[in-house]
Amino acid sequence: MSQALKHFLNLTDAGGDAIAAMLNDALDRKSARAGQPKGKADADAPLGGRVLAMVFEKNSTRTRVSFDIAMRQLGGSALILDAGTTQLGRGETIADTARVLSRMADAIMLRTDDHAKVEELARHATVPVINGLTDLSHPCQIMADLLTVIEHGKALPGLEVAWLGDGNNVLNSIVEAAGLMKFNVRIGVPEGYESDAGMIEAAVLAGAGIRVIRDPVEAVRGADVVVTDTWISMGQAHAEAKLAAMAPYQVNDALMAHAKPDAVFLHCLPAHRGEEVTDAVIDGPRSVVWDEAENRIHAQKSVLRWVFGQI
């Protein structure tokens, strides 16, 4: 593998300085194309002629659409491979898939339940590999979240972020971002549903303030940003017991009242309205989830430019 090859499997693959540069690039490029048709290429078309192979082992709306549009706006193109309709679904190895796609595409994005698969893909690919979501982390989503927070006038260093609910892959990447960008996270989570302990330890060592708090009110008190996600993933067992444990952590108006008056609400979507969040919050004035969803495009454009060595 070439020393110059860049993969984006976790936020730590880039580091804080590169993340800051990508966020600045995303802000600039988004502003520069304001009002343009969404399928129109940016004036400089920096990825002209490049092809992104998108491999999906999990269903997707936002990841699929945002990467496709991102490549179009950068002057390139994207193709979709669903595991169920390719040889991956019939037993072809990740290593062989990596070798083949490296000969046919300029970069590969994988969305999968198993983080070990994206790591194996990167080991055998000779083109950049991007994590579109795994069971461990969701770095592209957090790039969009950080971009959204900055757009709404909040500086990352010293930011107080409150997470409510399941300690999942999205939270793992928020914790990782906290260590890199020097902000704090209060994790409001019931016992037994905590996030990855290794990622928390690494973030604390890097300078983030990470606290696990059982009381949802204390987790949210004075927060600049309140974040949640779905409690039950597709096919997850023991759903009734988990829903009961999570119920006190629902983000509703009463809970949001304990955050700062100018706090914003984030959710990566899709939302299970009435479970982890109420209609009043997600549709309310402090919700920025639709900006957050759009920003998947703009953040991922900069991630793509970074893996190709343009940032």
Curated annotation (Swiss-Prot):
Reactions the enzyme catalyzes: carbamoyl phosphate + L-ornithine = L-citrulline + phosphate + H(+)
InterPro entries: Asp/Orn_carbamoyltranf_P-bd, Asp/Orn_carbamoylTrfase, Asp/Orn_carbamoylTrfase_sf, Asp_carbamoyltransf_Asp/Orn-bd, Orn/put_carbamltrans, OTCase_ArgI
Main location: cytoplasm
Record: residues binding carbamoyl phosphate: S60, T61, R62, T63, Q87, R111, H138, P139, C140, Q141, C268, L269, R296
Organism: Novosphingobium aromaticivorans (strain ATCC 700278 / DSM 12444 / CCUG 56034 / CIP 105152 / NBRC 16084 / F199)
A single GO molecular function term of this UniProt record: ornithine carbamoyltransferase activity
Keywords: Amino-acid biosynthesis, Arginine biosynthesis, Cytoplasm, Transferase
Known EC number: 2.1.3.3
UniProt KW Heme keyword: no
Localization: Cytoplasm
Function according to Swiss-Prot or TrEMBL: Reversibly catalyzes the transfer of the carbamoyl group from carbamoyl phosphate (CP) to the N(epsilon) atom of ornithine (ORN) to produce L-citrulline.
Residue positions binding L-ornithine: N169, D229, S233, M234
Protein family membership: Belongs to the aspartate/ornithine carbamoyltransferase superfamily. OTCase family.
CC per GO annotation: cytoplasm
Pathway this chain belongs to: Amino-acid biosynthesis; L-arginine biosynthesis; L-arginine from L-ornithine and carbamoyl phosphate: step 1/3
Any GO BP: arginine biosynthetic process via ornithine
Protein name (Swiss-Prot/TrEMBL): Ornithine carbamoyltransferase
